[in-house]
Amino acid sequence: MSDFYVRYYSGHHGRFGHEFLEFDYHSDGLARYANNSNYRNDSLIRKEMFVSELVLKEVQRIVDDSEIIKESDESWPPENKDGKQELEIRMNGKHIMFETCKLGSLADVQNSDDPEGLKVFYYLIQDLKALCFSLISLNFKLRPVKN
């Protein structure tokens, strides 16, 4: 798993500046999360933690099972006024990067030129976000047990 890396970014430049959500997993177990929103003067939220090899294997399994590596973003909608999404994956000797506009719902996916490929991307992102949010929530809410 020495060449494993996954990074997701979703963001835009709007009236509140550069707002984005980004997270990544590294082969050494480092997992990072950043969320920047200037709405109501919110500030940048950054979280870092180390996850076990088992968690990394689960992330890799999720990516493998999605078969996203077989897809191409050539026919996907490009970045627009609502922003963009990026997914970068390095695993099994392959390095691939996808970029498309922000997708609000499955209707956006179905109305695209490549609904099947974009559906793979859409559901993979949902799975990766759910895992990331769960890990962040658990890691920063748990308190060590005192003897």
Curated annotation (Swiss-Prot):
CDD domains: Mago_nashi. Belongs to the mago nashi family. This is Protein mago nashi homolog. The keyword Cytoplasm applies. The keyword Ion transport does not apply. GO terms for cellular component: cytosol; exon-exon junction complex; nucleus. Keywords: Cytoplasm, Nucleus. SUPFAM superfamilies: Mago nashi protein (SSF89817). One of its GO terms (biological process) is nuclear mRNA surveillance of spliceosomal pre-mRNA splicing. InterPro entries: Mago_nashi, Mago_nashi_sf. It is found in: Cytoplasm; Nucleus. It comes from Schizosaccharomyces pombe (strain 972 / ATCC 24843) (Fission yeast). The lineage of its organism: Eukaryota, Fungi, Dikarya, Ascomycota, Taphrinomycotina.
